[in-house]
Amino acid sequence: MPHRARDTVLEPPELRARREFPVAWAGAGPQHPGMIRKAPKSDAAPPAKGVIAVAPPSFRRERALLKRGIWPVAGCDEAGRGPLAGPVVAAAVVLDPKRIPKGLDDSKKLTAEKREALFEEICATASFAVAYASPARIERDNILRASLWALARAVQALPEPPKHVFVDGRDKIITPCDCDAVIGGDALVLSIAAASIIAKVARDRLMCRLAEDCPGYGFDHHKGYGVPEHLAALDRLGPTKHHRKLFAPVAAAWDKHAPGERETAAAPPDLFGLSASA
């Protein structure tokens, strides 16, 4: 039976180092496995105090498991918890240790152009799966449970069941194998970083398609987030079937455009499925 992995949530050594040593030297020389670089051995002037050199995500956790014969190892992340419209999109990725795309990082640190390029590289070299939690599921389960459900579904949809899973954040997901929750994992674990890119690009592309279905809301620009342009459209046009009606700005728009109907309106069915590729 599926079970939850160990109850403890890992605090990565990188984050512990950053918490315990808030000021660090940055410069040339061998890089510490975590987020702190050692003081330069050269005579070059040190950088200003308070600067922390942040290393890119690494493959060391996955490689350690691979050396123990534990493989495949999947990284999981989601995109779209905060928007007022559209689904939460979750991705699970198993990187090929011999064909890891260069430049993988937390999707939030990358430009849209770089994310798109890496998305194509990941799809061409890795196994992955994408799952969607629709606004209907978010309304039924709440945003956290819907997100965890989508993450678990993405893992289940992988072409080959993983033997270990790393998931971004504090919350583990229910899997048939061990699962480690890694706080800040999209900036620390390479497989999670890859999953963050897949989830982000998949969701952005979906929101651009929804913009064609719902003109006037600007979904292709803000991707459903509560920016002034979106709030103005909600106030002017009212909510669509893609909006999350329990989120406060959407609820206010419901009450303005259809008083009394928000609680009785039937939630639309799940409009999104899942996809996977080896």
Curated annotation (Swiss-Prot):
Primary location: cytoplasm
InterPro entries: RNase_HII, RNase_HII/HIII, RNase_HII/HIII_dom, RNaseH-like_sf, RNaseH_sf
Enzyme Commission (EC) number: 3.1.26.4
Family statement: Belongs to the RNase HII family.
Source taxonomy: Bacteria, Pseudomonadati, Pseudomonadota, Alphaproteobacteria, Hyphomicrobiales
Coiled-coil residue spans: none
Presence of keyword Nucleotide-binding: no
GO biological process, one term: DNA replication, removal of RNA primer
Cofactor binding description: Manganese or magnesium. Binds 1 divalent metal ion per monomer in the absence of substrate. May bind a second metal ion after substrate binding.
A GO molecular-function annotation: RNA binding
Keywords (A to Z) from UniProt: Cytoplasm, Endonuclease, Hydrolase, Manganese, Metal-binding, Nuclease
Name of the encoding gene: rnhB
Cofactor(s) demanded: Mn(2+); Mg(2+)
Protein name: Ribonuclease HII
Compartment annotation: Cytoplasm
Signal peptide from the UniProt entry: none
Catalytic activity: Endonucleolytic cleavage to 5'-phosphomonoester
